Amino acid sequence: VSWGALIGGHALQGNTHVAILRFKEMQLQGMKPNKMIMLNVLKACGGSGGINIVEVQSIHDQIIRNELETEPAIGNTLLDMYAKCGSLIEALEVFHALQARDVVSWSAMMRAYNAECGLSSKVFDIFVEMEAAGIEPDAVIFSCVLKACAFARAISEGRLLHERIIRAGFDS
């Protein structure tokens, strides 16, 4: 059985500690992780319900050491992990380092800002920046921006956004 299958299986089953332990064993044997292994290890960090920021930072260090930080899927997953644990500074660093941002990147960054309730204006800013970059909002993006409208009590902006949601066909 390959290390990737072993780590991925444990991550899928929610066996966070075992997945990370196997990852560390793999490294002790001198094996270099690939993209899929790193994705599975990152997902394992969030699999048990509580995301361990120390583990995410450790995995991030491994990603950098193994020169995998330019992989879009890894960057997005790492950004999402930092966002989920409320680590805004690290999320921003990963976001700005991404060479190619897609709708997943933008929504993860919006979730990070929404986790910090006082930063709704940043969600609006990033929404405008995303559209300027030519990225079309999806249901997740609209949800993030609506949440920011609620936090900011931005009723008129919320109404305008609701109209856009209807025009985009996400109202059902």
Predicted stretch roles:
Residues 3-4, 8, 19, 30, ...:
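Pentatricopeptide repeat
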Residues 14, 51, 86, 117-118, ...:
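Residue-level detector of the short coil/turn that links helix A to helix B
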